Regions:
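Short acidic/histidine-centered micro-motifs embedded in hydrophobic/aromatic stretches
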Residues: 29, 69, 75
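Thiotemplate assembly-line natural product biosynthesis machinery
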Residues: 1-23, 77-80
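Phosphopantetheine carrier-protein modules
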Residues: 18-37, 55, 59-61
Length: 81
């Protein structure tokens, strides 16, 4: 799966919990939760959605690594390869 495809899946998932967000303005290196004002419960639901969509199990111990868009893309690329 390409980086672009993974990014589109991430944005699709984020749009479910932050439908008003402008994802074109989302920084690839900034904290997604802060930029989109997402609480921990919504972020957890987003990660569960990624697991459902991609079949990638994301252990709770890895949540702290998933801060920015780049973090998410890199993490998912590694597990999907």
């Amino acid at each position: 799966m390409t980086e672009t495809e993974i990014r589109e899946i991430i944005i699709s998932g984020l749009s479910q919990i932050a439908p008003e967000a402008d994802f074109e303005e989302l920084s690839p290196t900034e904290n997604i939760r802060e930029e989109l004002d997402i609480d921990s419960f919504d972020f957890l639901n987003f990660l569960i959605g990624l697991d459902d969509k991609l079949g990638v199990d994301i252990p709770e111990s890895d949540y702290e690594k998933l801060i920015s868009m780049n973090d998410l893309i890199g993490y998912l690329q590694e597990r999907l390869s």
